[in-house]
Curated annotation (Swiss-Prot):
One of its GO terms (cellular component) is extracellular region. Monomer. It comes from the Bacteria. It comes from Pseudoalteromonas carrageenovora. Pfam families: Beta-prop_CGLA, CGLA_C, CGLA_M. This is Lambda-carrageenase.
Amino acid sequence: MKIKILSAMVASSLLIGCVIPTVKASQSAIKSIETNRTITKVRTGMLSGGSSIITTSYEGTVAAYKFNGEKLWENELSGFMNHDIWVQDINGDGLVEIFAANADGNVYCINSDGSLKWTFGLNEVPMNSVTVISDADKKYVVAGGYDKNLYYISTNGELLKTIESGTYSEEGVFGDGVKPEARTHTVNFVRPVKSSDGTEKLVVLGTNNSLQSSGRFYIFEPFADLPSEKSRISIKKGIGDLRTVDFDNDGNDELTLGNSAQIGDAAISVMNLDDLSQKKSQINDIARRIDRFGYRVAQTEVVMNEGTPTYLTLFGSRILLTPESFDVNDSEILANKYSYYDMWKDKSSNKLVLASAQSGGSQVHIIDTSNPSWKSAYEELEPQGKLAAIQENTRAIERQLSNFQKPTRERAPLPVYFISESRNEIPTTIERSEFLYDSPVFLNYSTLPNVENWDRSEVLADNPKYRDKRDRRKNYTLSSEEMFNKLSAGYDNSDGISQWAGHGNDPYMISLATMKRIISSGDGKKTVNIYPEIEGHGDAFNKVLSDHFYPLAEFSSENNANLFMRNKHTFWQSTIYAPEWSELRSGRLADAFVPAMEETTDKSMEMSVAGRMGLWAAGSVDNWGERYARDNPSFDRLRQHSHQMVPNHALRQIIYKIASGARYINNFGFNQEYMSLAWELIGKGALYVPKREELLSLSPVHISMKEPDPIYRETSNNVKWTTFYDEEKDSIPYVFSRLNGTWPGAKTLPWDYSNYAADTKERRLDFIPKFPKGLVLITPVQQGKFKDEGTVRGTLADNMHPIYKDIMKEYITDGKNYYNPNGEQVMAADSVRYRQIKNKIEEKSNLLPMTVSGEAAWVVAQSAEKHLRLTLVDSGYLNPSNKVAKVKFNSVTPVAIVDVLSGETFSPDSNGVVEIPVLAGAFRFIDVKITEDLRNMQSSTL
């Protein structure tokens, strides 16, 4: 924990190499303060320097700034995210203390000078909300989170009272599958509400599901054990914002709340606490007047608009100014280019403070709503700092790429299939790419609101569960002939087609017979059938595999078609190792199945890439895929700030995965002009797409999965409920742990694979993982009792680069424990075994040509006889920053090290280490010339 105090204004000289003015001209309606960090929450309060802005950053650093831009101090706290901060004076000195509800399970109290006052915490379950409530002359700190308790804490940090939600909650459970206990909840928000007589009450917003329930209000008298009132919430979906306002200035607070949702469900509400009445307004009513897609949190304050009190709602990149009617149809709408993480009203000045832009911004913005030009100033606001830098860094790469020529020594680029790009947004760019390059390949993608209505009674006579399943999003109206005509037409004047062909809700949207006919009509052109969220258990699902998926895969393998299995959660490192999926693992259908992911709500991205690549390296499949959607950042569905308008995070995600060998890309078509840089990098050969036998950044140590432990399999795929925490059960160590809905942003445990193998420290968004000692694959078992019988995939080393032939080391797990090959010895996840694995990863990393540390993601592949291609990527998914990649050469001697785009050269020091800068939001492609062809070297000489 570090604190830095600054006594004078800090010049904003960013690591990105440019100097940004700290504050805009004083006469402007908007002033911007550079922080050099991605600011996710803002508050205001009185510090020794006067009224000040309090910020918390993506990584949990709390800092204070004067309104003139002077930085007062910062405190790094735990290094984990703060789910909530609250600012209030608790000791009567006129200066505020700052309270942070941290994902490490603690509440931190920070003094007004930035020093730590106290820490409160009973476990490592994330704290989610914190506030202060007054009762006459007493003040209490109140906090709660995912352990389902509400805590009263003294102003000195001592526990005064614990209130278990099970003593008063009315939250119900619903749906199929394993469900948590009913009548319990997690604390989504806790806030004080003031009355005109000076008294306060405590409002707790409790919920048990991050996606499908808005929860309830529970209203307490200060320090009471039970609520005096309860109320349902009038809007649907998880609530992402709750705050108090006083619209009519009568001294009695009202509550404004907004949900965390996509546009179809987006809504705001205001609650009168006198009678618990609520007014609501559906933002979807004005969807045509705002940008429709994206996942946003609606945040509502009250401002004076031309002398009239008005509700101001920040909704992504839009501000809605709504009159007293609270009807958004009457709103004035202000549009900016970017979306912002948070908004706070400073009551002493009536100014609004915006947190950083979600696309990688680093500034906070102060809006003076008393300035007549503030509306136009907001619409014209162009954040500087990191956001400007990452866009300039992208443009610099584009300029360098225009002069790049692929070395003649390298083979032709492998085809990379973009299976869902929109030809409507930038058709000429796609046409140009198709004219100039053989790769990437763009398929004709069809969305299917209407699907086949076929007679399932005979084919599925013995499977009534799936015979009767339907997806509510689809209209079952087409005949087989109509379905055929609609899709087969896509082959005309194209390289192939792609479409949703089914879903976990209904795998049979298109009958097997019709789909075979469609594929045949393509005459060998590529067909990709997308199957999202395929997950099932028991005899009924086994029949789906044997009657539909495996026969379709056999037919596909003979007709240049693929099944793009877009599964969720931990499927590729848990469910895939269940007995019913043995045929996919066997390798007999390797050219048909493409493992892919839909990783919204997930917090285990570093594992999923290791799982997909493990099946690929093992020979179970010949290809693997990746997907980007607007809600990829939605690891916490209760706070879906997933409206990034510059998809730099997505660009880096896709580049890292393609550099790792992914060749089937399922992107949501958004800002394709920006994303098209990836197409050009592939087409010109700057982004090297490796075969699996060319990769050299894989650790020789791999974790092999036997049939998954049933509790691990179930809990790691059950992520929407927030109330599964059980102290006794959660104390049991697992190799893959803290994966259900209880743990957003939580720290990973030392014995967890994510921690010791991937260097992933939190359950959040590691889409671009570091793996500093080499990517540790999660694979099928290679030897011993748990090895699959009757496979044709060969051994792992058979499919990998020749250097791996005699250096591989396998450790076997079921997700909970470790096992020796004969199954006679079982070792707990937190036993000495994990330390042995960690040490072995370190030891074996010296056998790799190189390893990379320093917060940059990396991939190495052999690109030619005596050349290696090193791809370096800024790993900060939503908080990009300058990185320094420390490249350590181990088993090779570099002759020359050159950036293939910029031409910059590098030389290692006497320890064989070279430091290569990676700019914020950027990536580099480095050619390393070596003395020998690694394919001819014996592993014993490495």
